Amino acid sequence: MQYWLMKSEPDVWSIDQQIKAGEKGADWDGVRNYQAANNLKKMQKGDLCFFYHSNIGKEIVGIVEVIKTAFIDPTDKEKRFVAVKVRFKSKLQNPVTLENIKKTKALENLSLIKQSRLSVMPIDTKSWKIILKMGKIN
């Protein structure tokens, strides 16, 4: 299993909308950056992803699970980019802010800090566990 972080602007797609999508999940589409799209292509069924609210809040608010691997993004008319399907797993009891991540020495090499414009990025196991603890998830 691999771990990831996926960013969404909450006024476009929020964790609450993801929850409402239920067990059938929802397409994670609209990614138009090649590096982020390549990360989507690497995702496997069962991988877990932090759900990050960008622009408004700038915080990790929940976890989603990949339930369908990469397929042609239905919102891409040129059919160059991919989407995955994810379903809600849990909300963090304590959202983990970008500010708190930046203050945590053990997380200083996260792509979230180093490549702040990247919308889909891998998270190493050690960082995943640290963020879970910060978010009060066992």
Regions found by a protein language model. Give the residues of each.
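Loop/turn positions that initiate beta-strands
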Residues: G46-D47
